[in-house]
């Protein structure tokens, strides 16, 4: 059974305001309900070195925001971030330093740690992306079951009842999601694991693996 604790999936980003929150809970899904309030508290206190481009949107230094991008607060975007044309940030979002949010990518109630890339046509809702995580073009982190029931995380025979209706995915550090893949609600991708294009993922995938298909997982050499 794979370990799914916050400290099992993520390492410190070196960005204090992100690390303080991410490592405040034992499990990553426990973070989702407090993201909005945490961002609001940071904005109210003020963050040195950040510019306020809207009453509830802060951006860091050397960050570029395309004119056609849409950003709804509360949102904090770090340093050296690129938000490209057509990006849609729906609020309750933290985008860590050196990250990319690309054309037609939509983020909602999510944290991207350091150097994350969601560059083309991605949906990232109610999710946490670790350092250097990458979502290939058209990959979707689905956050709502078709029956609207609370999300259950399936971990090698153990079913973890979260009691939460909306959960996307938790991508650990250096997780790489192939183009056109769909991650079902509650999917966890371990550190340094690669998902092949057009794969449907459900459950927990171990670190240092290659996911070639829904039921084909091999250890990296």
Placement of each model-derived feature along the sequence:
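Surface-exposed loop/turn and secondary-structure junction residues enriched for glycine/proline
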Residues: 12-13, 25, 56, 62, ...
């Amino acid at each position: 059974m794979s370990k799914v604790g916050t400290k099992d999936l993520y390492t410190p980003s070196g960005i204090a305001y992100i690390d303080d929150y991410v490592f405040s809970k034992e499990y990553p899904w426990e973070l989702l309900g407090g993201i909005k309030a945490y961002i609001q508290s940071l904005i109210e206190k003020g963050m040195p070195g950040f510019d306020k481009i809207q009453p509830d949107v802060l951006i860091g230094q050397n960050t570029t925001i395309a004119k056609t991008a849409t950003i709804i607060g509360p949102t904090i975007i770090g340093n050296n971030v690129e938000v490209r044309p057509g990006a849609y940030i729906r609020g309750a979002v933290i985008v860590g330093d050196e990250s990319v949010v690309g054309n037609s990518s939509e983020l909602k109630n999510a944290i991207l740690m350091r150097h994350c890339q969601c560059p083309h046509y991605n949906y990232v809702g109610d999710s946490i992306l670790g350092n250097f995580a990458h979502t290939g073009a058209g990959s979707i982190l689905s956050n709502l079951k078709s029956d609207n029931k609370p999300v259950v995380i399936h971990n090698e025979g153990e079913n973890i009842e979260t009691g939460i209706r909306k959960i996307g995915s938790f991508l650990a550090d250096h997780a790489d999601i192939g183009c056109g893949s769909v991650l079902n609600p509650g999917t966890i991708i371990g550190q340094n694991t690669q998902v092949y294009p057009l794969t449907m993922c459900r459950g927990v995938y171990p670190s240092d693996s290659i996911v070639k298909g829904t039921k084909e997982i091999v250890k990296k050499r």
